[in-house]
Amino acid sequence: MFSIGFIIIAVIIVVALLILFSFVPVGLWISALAAGVHVGIGTLVGMRLRRVSPRKVIAPLIKAHKAGLNLTTNQLESHYLAGGNVDRVVDANIAAQRADIDLPFERGAAIDLAGRDVLEAVQMSVNPKVIETPFIAGVAMNGIEVKAKARITVRANIARLVGGAGEETIIARVGEGIVSTIGSSEHHTEVLENPDNISKTVLSKGLDSGTAFEILSIDIADVDISKNIGADLQTEQALADKNIAQAKAEERRAMAVASEQEMKARVQEMRAKVVEAESEVPLAMAEALRSGNIGVKDYYNLKNIEADTGMRNAINKRTDQNDDESPQQ
C-alpha cells in the first residue's frame, strides 16, 4: 500500500512539474537570474496569460541590461503588444548609446511603429549613406541638352524620422535643382567646365527640409552631352511651317481648279444659249418674210454678209496658225 501511494504521488509531482515547465519558461527565468535581471515567475505567467511570448521580451531585456540600459519589462511588453519589433528597438538603443546619440526608448519605439527601420537609421546616423541619382537631363540656354548624375551623401535625422519624407523626395528635389541650374546656364560648356557649380547651387537651397535626412554633400559623378534640343525644335518648326504652306498651296490650287471648272461650265452654258438663240434665227427670218418685214433681196444680202464674215474668219484662223508655226520652224 505504501509503495503504491508513493508511486501515485510521484506521478502527480512529475505531471505537475511538466505542466509548470510547459507553461512557465523556467530555463528563461534561470537565464535572466544568471544575467542579473530579476524577473518573477508571476511576471512570466502573466505574459503567458496575456499571450505575450516571454522570450521576445526577456531576451531583449537581458541584452539591454548587459549594455547598461535601464529598461523595464512593462516598456518592452507594451511595445510588443503594439506590434513592434522589441529586439530591433533594443539593438537600436544599444547602438545609439555606443555612438553617443540621444535616443530614448519611447522615440525608438515610435519610429519602429511608424514603419521605419530604427536600427538602420541609427547606423545611417553613424555611417552616412550615399544615394545615387539616375541621369537627369536639362537644357542650357543655347539649346544643348546636358545629362548629369549626382551622388548625395545623407545622414539620418532621427528627430524627423517620424513624419519626414524619404529618399524619393531627396532625389526629386536634387533633380529639380540640377535641371534648374543647367537651364540657367547660357552655354552648355559652362556646365562641363564647372560641374561643381551645380552641387554648390543645389546644396545651398536647403533641400533636406521636411525630410528624414540631412544632406551632407552633393557631388556630380558624371556629365554627358545628349543632343541639340534647340536645333531639333527649329527643324520641327520649319517642317511644320512647310506642311502648313503646302496645305495652303494645295487649298489655293484646289480653289483654282474649282474656279476653272466653274468657268468651263459657264462657257458651255453660254454656248448652249448661243446655239439656242441661233436655232431661233431661221424661224424669225421665216416669220419676217411671211409678214413682209423684209424682202427677198434683203434676205440674200444678209446671206452674202454671213458668207463674207465666215470667209474672213477662216482666213484669220489660217493666218494665226501660220504665225504660230513659223517660230517653231
From Swiss-Prot:
GO CC term (a single one): membrane raft
Localization per record: Cell membrane; Membrane raft
Pfam name, any one: FloA
Keywords, in A-Z order: Cell membrane, Membrane, Transmembrane, Transmembrane helix
Bilayer disposition of the protein: Multi-pass membrane protein
Phosphoprotein keyword on record: no
Top-level taxon of origin: Bacteria
Coiled-coil zones: none
Entry keyword Transmembrane: yes
Family note: Belongs to the flotillin-like FloA family.
Family annotation (NCBIfam families): PRK13665.1 (NF010186)
Oligomer status and interactors: Homooligomerizes.
Listed name of the protein: Flotillin-like protein FloA
Origin species: Staphylococcus epidermidis (strain ATCC 35984 / DSM 28319 / BCRC 17069 / CCUG 31568 / BM 3577 / RP62A)
